[in-house]
Amino acid sequence: MARRRRFLSNQGVYHVYNRAEQGAAIFASDGAKRLFVEALFRVVELCGWELFAFAVMSNHFHLLLSTPRGNLDVGMHVLQSDFANKHKAFRGSIGHVFQSRYRADHCASGPLAAARMDYVHLNPVRAGLVSMQQLCQYPWTSYQSLRHPGSRGRLAIGAGLELLHGICDTPAGWDAYELRLRSVLTTDQRSLTETELFESFVARRRGALSEAKGADLRVNRSRAELVADEMARWEEILTEVLKAEGVTREALVGRPPSDAVKVGVAIKVRQRCPAYSSWLTERLRMGSPDYARQLMARFKGSGRSIGGV
C-alpha cells in the first residue's frame, strides 16, 4: 500500500505520536525516558519548534507542538533516529524501534488543539500510572513544569495555555487549568492499559480532523520546498563552520573519513542544526551514516576538545 501523503505546514498545531514496534516497552526505565526527553529538547531547539505539551509512556509518546519553519519531517526524523540508534546500541539489538515513521494530526489553534493538550497531559492518569493528585510529580510529562516556570527551559506550556485555552500563565491560570483537567476526567473515567489507551485513541481520532485541515492552514509551498529550505540552512551553517576552522570542502575531500577535522566539523554542525547523518557524510565524505555516527560518538566520548580541530 502506498504511504499516505504527509501534510506539512508552518501554521497551526501538530499532535504527534508514535508507538514502539510491537508495543515493546522501550521507555520502561527512567533512563530511557530521560534519553528521549533530552533528544526531544535538543530537536526543539535546533528546529525552532514550540513544544506546548509532551508525555512519555512506557511504549509510546505524545507531543503537541507548532513548527514555524514547517520542518516537522526533519525534526521527527532526527528525534526518532537519535533515540533509536542509542537504544539499539545500548541493548545490542537490531531492527525497527518504532512501528512507523510517526503519526501527526494537524489542526488550527482552537478547541480541538486545546483538547489534545488535555489528552496528552492526562495520559499517565488514564493509564493508571498516577492519580490526578500525583500528576504534578510525574516527571515524564510537561504538566510537571506547569507551576514551575523557571524549570521549563524551551518548553512552551505557558504559551500553550494562552494560545489554545485562553488561560493566563499565572498561579490563578494554573489552578484554572487543573480544574479543567479534573473536569475532563470526570466525564471519562475509564481505566485502560497503556496499549489500550493508545489503540483507543487511534481508533477514535480517525477522521476527526478532516474538517480542521482547511485551506487557511496550508502554505503556498510544497513539502519538498520546506525541506529544501531547512537543508539550505544546513549548507550555510556548514560553510560558516568550515570558514571558522580555516579549511575548505575541497581540502577535506582527500582526507580519510575518520579525519579529526572532518569529525570535529560534523559535530559542530550538528550542534547548530538537525542535519541528517546521511547529509553530513555526503558533504564531508565520511563513509556511511552509521560510521559517521560512531566517529562522532567516539570523538565526544574521548573528552577531546572540539574547538580548533
Where are these regions (language model features)?
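Short Pro-Cys-Gly-centered "Cys-loop" motif that presents a nucleophilic cysteine in a tight turn
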Residues: 1-58, 66-309
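Conserved N-terminal diphosphate/IPP-binding helix and adjacent helical/loop segment
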Residues: 63
